[in-house]
């Protein structure tokens, strides 16, 4: 019977952790071999067990605290809460303030993040209630006697709402200033294409995979400088087109803008051929051979002018390749 039961302590077969000097011993089963190694005083062991005991105390980073649970229960009673305790691991949605909770289990980190968010929102709501209560007291519309703590609130000498007073009523002469164009109030959701040229945020961030107007012909610059100049050229060209279309409503406060040079947007140049890695279409390039790619694509648009009256397929036509 003693040989049927492995004595304690021993490691269960299938344990994938480290056991000192186990790989140097042979001839016994895993359980008996680890039993000999664990009780051998000549073998250096760790001062404490790696695996925590079953009856170990619950750590602060393993489970949410009582204060956090109280905040979550109060929140569920006030609003239709999406985040209900416990927030199970595997939830792929957004959890507020979860990123700042480091070294905790998912349930503890998510509960702490939501509790912190609810505490901050409660401070905002308390401040909002204080401001509304103070405005009600200052306006004189309250039908109740002010308490001691209400008397300590900061007050002004004026009753709200205030009455607008012009400069003439004060005896001050109005200054005649030329009309100014109001600057558009841009928000953080405004596209950088329509920001002012002087705006520091008028550029495209790295990783943007959409079309950036007038950026094809620019190179050798950083992404911020390149996209800023491209967007400035685009907005200038857009205002130029608007002025040409609506001459009566042109904005005279902006300097005159000229159309960008057409040479920047020419694909087939008359004095040079295409680069060998160009993967686009070149007119007549399929029916030419015996020359380099640059010589073949030299002045490519001339092929269309020479064969503009072509009525049959180029394969069966008597084409002129001598140009």
Curated annotation (Swiss-Prot):
Recorded hits in InterPro entries, A to Z, give:
CMI2A-C-like_dom (IPR018902)
Identify the domain of life. Answer: Eukaryota
A single GO cellular-component term on record: cell projection
Q: Say yes or no: keyword Chaperone present.
A: no
Where it sits in the cell: the answer is:
Cytoplasm, Cytoskeleton, Cilium axoneme
What are the boundaries of the signal sequence? none
User: What main location does UniProt list?
Assistant: cytoplasm
Please give one Pfam family short name.
CMI2B-like
Please tell me whether the keyword Glycoprotein is annotated for this protein.
no
Record's keyword terms, sorted: Cell projection, Cytoplasm, Cytoskeleton
> Main role?
Probable microtubule inner protein (MIP) part of the dynein-decorated doublet microtubules (DMTs) in cilium axoneme.
Similarity section: Belongs to the CIMIP2 family.
**The name this protein goes by in its record:** CIMIP2 protein CG18335
């Amino acid at each position: 019977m003693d040989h049927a039961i492995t004595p304690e302590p021993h490691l269960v077969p299938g344990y994938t952790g480290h056991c000192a000097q186990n790989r140097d011993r042979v001839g016994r089963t895993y359980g008996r071999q680890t039993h000999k190694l664990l009780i051998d005083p000549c073998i250096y062991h760790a001062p404490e067990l790696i695996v925590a005991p079953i009856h170990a105390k619950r750590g602060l980073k393993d489970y949410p605290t009582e204060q956090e649970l109280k905040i979550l229960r109060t929140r569920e009673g006030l609003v239709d809460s999406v985040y209900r305790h416990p927030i199970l691991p595997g939830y792929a949605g957004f959890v507020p303030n979860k990123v700042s909770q480091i070294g905790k289990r998912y349930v503890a980190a998510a509960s702490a993040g939501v509790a912190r968010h609810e505490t901050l929102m409660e401070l905002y709501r308390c401040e909002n209630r204080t401001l509304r209560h103070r405005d009600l007291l200052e306006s004189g519309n309250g039908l109740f006697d002010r308490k001691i703590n209400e008397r300590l609130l900061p007050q002004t000498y004026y009753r709200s709402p205030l009455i607008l007073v012009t400069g003439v009523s004060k005896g001050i002469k109005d200054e005649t200033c030329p009309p100014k164009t109001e600057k558009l109030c841009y928000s953080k959701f405004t596209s950088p294409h329509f920001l002012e040229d002087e705006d520091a945020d008028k550029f495209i961030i790295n990783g943007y995979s959409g079309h950036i107007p007038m950026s094809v012909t620019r190179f050798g610059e950083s992404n911020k400088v390149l996209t800023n100049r491209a967007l400035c050229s685009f907005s200038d060209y857009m205002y130029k087109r608007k002025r040409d279309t609506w001459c009566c409503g042109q904005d005279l406060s902006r300097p005159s803008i000229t159309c960008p040079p057409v040479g920047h947007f020419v694909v087939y140049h008359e004095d040079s051929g295409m680069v060998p890695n160009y993967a686009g279409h070149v007119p007549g390039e399929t029916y030419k051979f015996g020359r380099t790619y640059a010589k073949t694509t030299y002045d490519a648009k001339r092929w269309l002018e020479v064969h503009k009256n072509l009525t049959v397929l180029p394969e069966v036509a008597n084409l002129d390749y001598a140009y």
